[in-house]
Amino acid sequence: MMKHVLNKCLMGESLSVQEAEQVMEQIMSGRATASQVASLITMMRVRGETAEEILGFAKGMRAYARKFPAVIEGTIDTCGTGGDGLGTFNISTASALVLASLGVPVAKHGNRSVSSKSGSADVLEELGINIQASVEEACQMLETTNLCFLFAPLYHQSMRHVAGPRKEIGFRTIFNLLGPLTNPAGARYQLLGVYDEAAALKMGEALRQLGSEHSLLVTGADGLDECAIHGDTHVVEVKDGRCETYRFSPDDVGLPLGNLADIQVDTPAESAALIRAIFSGDGPQAAKNIVALNAGAALYACGNASHIAEGVHYASKAIESKRVFRYLQSLQQQGRGIKHA
């Protein structure tokens, strides 16, 4: 089958959802060779992956994922594609802490850094959160603390078959888009950061067909894979079986413009230090505001706010009152941390 698909892609043709799902089954089962995988994802990248191909690959990847038994109503994931090259701190991870402190169940799906300076796993480890929790431990954490981290390599072990080709070719491929679409806990609410508006549209269509309840796919100014504080944010909103697009600025939700430089870091340790500063009452205002902005958008996505501006208000109050900082400390005091905040 792989030879047929490769020839089809060589001719510039795209794959149907069914074909893409079958190809992913070949890849996940280890039946496709490394050279076949590299050739396929390179041709798809050059041509441009379609929404149907993204959907089929996501279905195939979900079928091979380790199942997460706990299903808590209203669970959300704050996840991004990475790859924006802007070197910002882990905004979606900080936003997840805000949400959990407010009682929203968050199943944070992520990995160590691949294309960024600090992956979600890297910064959580610095903050003292257990990233290597077993499935049972993660379930318990979600139920008792509202937050668990689903370390991608533990749940998507079949992805080992593409690790070599991805590393060797070194550029973004369809696999960069799949992580946010394959949350093991089946989170039907998402705030999903995407580095490119066109990719966000395709991923939004895939999420719609995968049964997302309500998701916001956001692309900030300069391709930031978060809601931006330094410019406008493009949104693909998936809700009620439809995809809609719009833009908004920080001013539209009651926040001033901030400087990109105030939210950039070089290492996971710097990212963790900035997150601690934000929640303890220090840190640049732009950093506080971008966390409130993204947490506010997530509160809207999971139905805990009637619009983004209202969510920003709730998130800002949680940060300013140090509710989030106390929550972070409580995670460690309960023995689930490995460092002190």
UniProtKB/Swiss-Prot annotation:
Cofactor: Mg(2+)
Cofactor: how and how many bound: Binds 2 magnesium ions per monomer.
Residues annotated to bind Mg(2+) 2: D225, E226
Gene3D superfamilies on file: Nucleoside phosphorylase/phosphoribosyltransferase catalytic domain (3.40.1030.10), Transferase, Pyrimidine Nucleoside Phosphorylase, Chain C (1.20.970.10)
Molecular-function annotations in GO: anthranilate phosphoribosyltransferase activity; magnesium ion binding
Residues the entry annotates as binding 5-phospho-alpha-D-ribose 1-diphosphate: 80, 83-84, 88, 90-93, 108-116, 120
Xref: InterPro entries: Anthranilate_Pribosyl_Tfrase (IPR005940), Glycosyl_Trfase_fam3 (IPR000312), Glycosyl_Trfase_fam3_N_dom (IPR017459), Glycosyl_Trfase_fam3_N_dom_sf (IPR036320), Nuc_phospho_transferase (IPR035902)
Protein name: Anthranilate phosphoribosyltransferase
Species of provenance: Shouchella clausii (strain KSM-K16)
Gene field: trpD
